[in-house]
Curated annotation (Swiss-Prot):
PANTHER family: 2',3'-CYCLIC-NUCLEOTIDE 3'-PHOSPHODIESTERASE (PTHR28141:SF1). GO terms for molecular function: 2',3'-cyclic-nucleotide 3'-phosphodiesterase activity. One of its GO terms (cellular component) is Golgi apparatus. It comes from Candida albicans (strain SC5314 / ATCC MYA-2876). It is found in: Golgi apparatus. Residues 133-146 have a biased composition (Polar residues). Keywords: Golgi apparatus, Hydrolase. Its EC number is 3.1.4.37. Residues 133-159 are annotated as: Disordered. This is 2',3'-cyclic-nucleotide 3'-phosphodiesterase.
Amino acid sequence: MGVALWLCPKRNTPTYDKLITVMSSLNTLFPGSPPKFEPHITITTNISLDLADQSKTKDDVDRILSASAVAMNSLPKNHESLVKLGNVNSQRKFFKKLYFEVEKDPNLVSFARIIRELFVIVPQDIEKENIKQNPQLYTKDNNGNTIRRKPSKKKSKTTEVKEFDTSFIRQAAAYKAAEWSVQEFDPHISLVYSDLWPLHSALWRNINTRISDIDWDIEWEFGVLKLVLCEGDVNDWVVLGSVDIH
């Protein structure tokens, strides 16, 4: 998943408190010790971010969060709530073992499309084209992946870099993002991460009882946007930065 953008409810709000309560309760129904995580909707994964240079990482995080906040705040105020909870569902996938479906509100879909276009598709496609146009800037790592060469400390001739027009790439990215938002964007709020499968009927009865014990007539304010490095164990995921949405 790499770096993901999460939309989270604000702490100490009814939405946050109720989700945390039910997530903690449901965790006890599953074997082992399912990892704990914040309630969130994943807007998109695989956001392009330079993690090698910490100073550049901070600048990129601030830039992406600032632009995301502007995009969120520019959405039409023509709905009661951007996030509307649906049914509880389950899949074989570890990260979608148990989750609330979330209605694909047009504004939520529009926001996800914008973020996907600007911070996933455009930078990835520009990088792919740059590899074609300027192969001298890249090398292979031990796993055979193409990576940028590190600047040489030795004095040498300046490497000539070929410039290229990115307008077509950006136009194509808009279409790719629109297609992704319709076919792949699947907003949901995970409640439990687990390898358990299938979920037997007795477990489902307990799940439904614990969920129905809580009044879900709640409004999700715009909340908080967070950039999260989702690599390795869930307990090791790192919040790189966040911004409140008012």
